[in-house]
């Protein structure tokens, strides 16, 4: 009798050990570094970047968790938690993600945290749920390894607003073509030595020419939007200020015949102080939706929590079908072998 009891116990123990993880719970578990998991994670990042209207494009840094749920009658749903890092490419920049550099820790990096539910059915992928938020590295941590590195400051900082207005005025003064308006302050930093302010901002072409503008408020954005991304530095000296600005204009679709073509984007060196232009417009159109600009706010970065509308965060109202990204991201090594534990996966760049 005792032998029979022992035999039954061993049989139950063997069945528990041989069952795959997640069996009986309605899901299967994959390793976070499994090629299948990484494939779906890259689809999630591609979806995120396509829905960004402000701030900077994201790149996959780490896969934290993954579960694959069966969906009746067909298909399965991937439940993912991933970490991303900010790149130096703006959300409106058409540069392929593989050519975008990851913003380094010395530049005051920003990390994103995202949850995705992605349906796979008949070989196609559809995002059912997407929710993200992002957080900059703490100033204290940045100063630990780089005491003189520039630190993120608020968009509504007096020096930031002044630097953006001065830089945009300098750009328009040197540009003999289209007059550009401010769309977004994307990033701002204080530099301790030499004392200066670094800013990155987005501009858009209007139906005015630079030499004819008397009232910027009457200048309207073109029907075929053309955006540009600018980086500027304003050095604060006792004897005055020095501003330098460089803008990259993004390619646009053919414009109407009566639109003024934009000239080449000049780089302004050490320009004399320029009278700031009129304040920014009350609202501008960014991508498919209107985004109120108003006055710069107290944020230091554009949080990913604003990337998705309430509809998109639950399910794609348009039934958008997603396809695998054609180009892998930079710095990716080959697929990792079996790991223990299954998750979290490897860190591709750095943790903050």
Curated annotation (Swiss-Prot):
The residues annotated as site (Cleavage) are: 143-144
Gene name linked to the record: Ahsg
Residues that bear Phosphoserine:
134, 138, 309, 313, 316, 318
Q: Give the protein's function.
A: Could inhibit both insulin-receptor tyrosine kinase activity and insulin-stimulated receptor autophosphorylation and, concomitantly, antagonize the mitogenic effect of the hormone in cultured rat hepatoma cells.
Which stretches of sequence are listed as region Disordered?
Answer: 256-280, 319-338
Q: Which domain of life is it from?
A: Eukaryota
Q: What are the annotated disulfide bridges?
A: 32-343, 89-100, 114-132, 146-149, 208-219, 230-247
Identify this protein by name. Alpha-2-HS-glycoprotein
State the organism named in the record.
Answer: Rattus norvegicus
GO cellular component terms given for this protein:
extracellular matrix; extracellular region; extracellular space; protein-containing complex
């Amino acid at each position: 009798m005792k032998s029979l009891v022992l035999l039954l116990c061993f049989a139950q123990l063997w069945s528990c050990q041989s069952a795959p993880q997640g069996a009986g719970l309605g899901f299967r578990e994959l390793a976070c570094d499994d090629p299948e998991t990484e494939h779906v994670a890259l689809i999630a990042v591609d979806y995120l970047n396509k829905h960004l209207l402000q701030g900077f494009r994201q790149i996959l840094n780490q896969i934290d968790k993954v579960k694959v749920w069966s969906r009746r009658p067909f298909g399965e749903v991937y439940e993912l938690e991933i970490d991303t890092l900010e790149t130096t490419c703006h959300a409106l920049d058409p540069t392929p993600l593989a050519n975008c550099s990851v913003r380094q820790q010395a530049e005051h990096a920003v990390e994103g945290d995202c949850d995705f539910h992605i349906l796979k059915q008949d070989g196609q992928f559809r995002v059912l749920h997407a929710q993200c938020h992002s957080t900059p590295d703490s100033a204290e941590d940045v100063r630990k390894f780089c005491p003189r590195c520039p630190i993120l400051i608020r968009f509504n900082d007096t020096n930031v607003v002044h630097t953006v207005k001065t830089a945009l005025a300098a750009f328009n003064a040197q540009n003999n073509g289209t007059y550009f308006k401010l769309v977004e302050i994307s990033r701002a930093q204080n530099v301790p030595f030499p004392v200066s302010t670094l800013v990155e901002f987005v501009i858009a072409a209007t139906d005015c020419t630079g030499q004819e503008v008397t009232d910027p408020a009457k200048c309207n954005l073109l029907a075929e939007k053309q955006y540009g991304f600018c980086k500027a530095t304003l050095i604060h000296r006792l004897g005055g200020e020095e501003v330098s600005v460089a803008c990259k204009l993004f390619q646009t679709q053919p414009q109407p015949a009566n639109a003024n073509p934009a000239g080449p984007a000049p780089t302004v060196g050490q320009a004399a102080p320029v009278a700031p232009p009129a304040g920014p417009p009350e609202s501008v159109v960014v991508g498919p939706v209107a985004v109120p600009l108003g006055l710069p706010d107290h944020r230091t970065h554009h949080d990913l929590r604003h990337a998705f509308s309430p509809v998109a965060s639950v399910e794609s109202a348009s039934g958008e079908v997603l396809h695998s990204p054609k180009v892998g991201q930079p710095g990716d090594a080959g697929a990792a072998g079996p790991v223990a534990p299954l998750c979290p996966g490897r860190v591709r760049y750095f943790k903050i």
